[in-house]
């Protein structure tokens, strides 16, 4: 069985990478038992609550991250240093995550067979 890690490292509205990544996760959730999401660097901005992408004529896919619970995708990690660099805390995020430091995040990534970045 493939263990897949999805790494979000781009901001939410500068490209379609975040939306495409989320779509891919939801589409493949039935085929892979062990999946985890990692949010690093600008990727932590994917999860910031109370975004209004329609004001910049962007599609609001951010709220679809709430679907992860319905798909039983519970392994969700956010880089602590990335949160701090953006002046954010766990309370600013849309979904429940585990906040880990960069070293722990790197160790977690080693458990996965495939890494897909968005």
Swiss-Prot record:
Presence of keyword Transport: no
Entries under Gene3D superfamilies matching the protein: DsrEFH-like
Pfam short name (any one): DsrE
Keyword NADP on entry: no
InterPro entries: DsrEFH-like (IPR027396), Sulphur_relay_DsrE/F-like (IPR003787), Sulphur_relay_TusC/DsrF (IPR017462)
SUPFAM superfamilies: DsrEFH-like
Endpoints of the signal sequence: none
Subcellular location field: Cytoplasm
Chief localization: cytoplasm
Keyword tags: Cytoplasm
A Gene Ontology cellular-component term: cytoplasm
NCBIfam families the record matches: PRK00211.1, sulf_tusC_dsrF
Job description of the protein: Could be part of a sulfur-relay system.
Sequence similarity: Belongs to the DsrF/TusC family.
Protein's name in the database: Protein TusC homolog
Organism this protein belongs to: Vibrio cholerae serotype O1 (strain ATCC 39315 / El Tor Inaba N16961)
The encoding gene: tusC
